[in-house]
């Protein structure tokens, strides 16, 4: 079978310019998803193209992804990234991945031993919020999670990311090997502390002495990641095949823009990512808050209200005058004033975001962005709302966004079509929706303390604003509610 590894590729395709035989698995990565392929792995590939070296990546997937891993192996661990801009495309073959392991194809034991190899310096992760097994209400390890329960009972055969990391670090310590840096690359707030809490929480349950050693010798840098990477579709894969002249089932499409801000705190070395444009900084938090509120908050706003209004893609929303105006107003009038970042022109940042959202070459589905809203809402919208409540400033679009989420998870769009709601709390949400009338819906969903905390449901100003926004959507539909809120 012909693959990108076995054919002569067209001249316009950018192939690796370095010696891949020199690569070692110095980075082990959890989660060979679309975002990682178009972001961290691609940036590492850029470093290798610039200066060579041995910073290869071993990709790990546990209980899914076996078909993707088999396909990756069949093409010598190469895959394609298509960067789609409004002005043209770039086709890139990424060669930074030199190995992959999967629990079904290989074994859990082989995966854990991979973490224990002497050359491993960084373990990076893109496993989504759910993968860290953290209780969102406390920020601590969720000891009621079935995988955590399993790992505490059988610690040498762990099934969770925290369990595997702790077991690997335990073995490295026993063998006299240096520890590795644990690098979360997930788009969640304070991701370095999230993974640190998960790992130390698991280690404390197993051995306080081990937890102390990890705390002293392992680093957990924070990161801010940014690139719009839609999930692969048959259509996007077919388009990439036309560029290549051969199929690549591991290929992914994305926008041209890319940003990675990384706390420069590594215990065993790192690639020279700054060569690829990565910003190595002392404190990631201001960058993270800017991105989560202005980009991700607006993305979620467009996803919920856009889906309800019948728009399938973010770029479709941006063709609509009201949605485009709302996105800009939300960013600059409601989200930007809540930030504390220096030396960044937030107006310019907002206009760049508008242009990225409007990119017609990207088909980023509103339904995809709307997934897992119960875990995204707190940092994307509610954090800014809390600041506005303290200042008594206007946050009417944020209120409409929260009400839009409530309407979306109620399971029916404005045309009366059923919505396939994907959320970690979907069972709980479904029960609350089924047990409440439209008039009671806001009160019912505000009982989700893991989303709204204890403070917001008890704040009469917050409750009143969300109820008013809900009534607007319920009475007029999402699009007209948006026009009413904007007064246009």
Which residue stretches match the model-derived regions?
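Substrate/ligand-engaging "lid" and interaction regions
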Residues: 1-488
């Amino acid at each position: 079978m012909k693959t990108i590894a076995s054919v002569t590729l067209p001249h316009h395709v950018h192939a690796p310019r370095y010696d891949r035989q020199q690569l070692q698995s110095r980075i082990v990565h959890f989660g060979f998803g679309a975002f990682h392929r178009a972001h961290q792995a691609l940036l590492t590939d850029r470093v290798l193209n610039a200066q060579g070296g041995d910073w290869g990546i071993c990709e790990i997937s546990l209980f899914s992804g076996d078909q993707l891993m088999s396909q990756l192996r069949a093409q010598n661990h190469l895959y394609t990234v298509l960067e789609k801009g409004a002005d043209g495309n770039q086709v890139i073959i990424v060669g930074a991945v030199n190995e992959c392991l999967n629990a079904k194809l290989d074994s859990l034991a082989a995966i854990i031993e991979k973490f224990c190899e002497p050359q491993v310096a960084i373990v990076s992760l893109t496993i989504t919020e759910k993968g860290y097994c953290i209780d969102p209400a406390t920020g601590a390890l969720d000891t009621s999670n079935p995988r955590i329960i399993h790992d505490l009972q059988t610690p040498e055969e762990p099934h969770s990311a925290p369990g595997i990391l702790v077991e690997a670090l335990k073995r490295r310590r026993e063998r006299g090997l240096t520890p590795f840096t644990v690098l979360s690359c997930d788009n969640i707030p304070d991701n370095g502390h999230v993974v640190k809490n998960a790992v130390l929480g698991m280690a404390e349950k197993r051995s306080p002495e081990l937890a102390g050693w990890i705390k002293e010798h392992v680093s957990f840098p924070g990161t801010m990641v940014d690139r719009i990477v839609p999930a692969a579709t048959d259509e996007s894969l077919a388009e990439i095949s036309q560029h290549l002249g051969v199929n690549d089932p591991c290929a992914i499409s994305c926008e041209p823009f890319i940003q990675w801000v990384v706390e420069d705190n590594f215990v065993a070395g790192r690639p020279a990512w700054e060569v690829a444009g990565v910003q190595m900084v002392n404190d990631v938090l201001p960058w993270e808050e800017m991105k989560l509120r202005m980009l991700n908050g607006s993305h979620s706003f467009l996803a919920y209200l856009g889906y309800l209004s019948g728009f399938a893609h973010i770029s479709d929303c941006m063709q609509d005058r009201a949605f485009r105006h709302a996105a800009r107003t939300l960013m600059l009038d409601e989200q930007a004033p809540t930030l504390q970042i220096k030396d960044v022109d937030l107006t310019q940042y907002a206009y760049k975001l508008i242009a990225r959202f409007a990119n017609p070459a990207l088909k980023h589905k509103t339904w995809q962005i709307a997934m897992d809203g119960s875990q995204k809402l707190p940092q994307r919208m509610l954090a800014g709302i809390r600041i506005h409540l303290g200042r008594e400033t206007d946050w009417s679009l944020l209120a409409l966004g929260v009400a839009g989420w409530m309407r979306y998870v109620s399971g029916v769009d404005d045309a009366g079509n059923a919505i396939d709601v994907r959320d970690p709390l979907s069972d709980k949400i479904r029960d609350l929706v089924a047990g409440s009338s439209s008039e009671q819906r806001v009160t019912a969903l505000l009982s989700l303390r893991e989303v709204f905390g204890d403070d917001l449901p008890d704040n009469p100003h917050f409750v009143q604003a969300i109820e008013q926004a809900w009534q607007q959507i319920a009475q007029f539909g999402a699009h007209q509610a948006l026009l009413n809120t904007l007064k246009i």
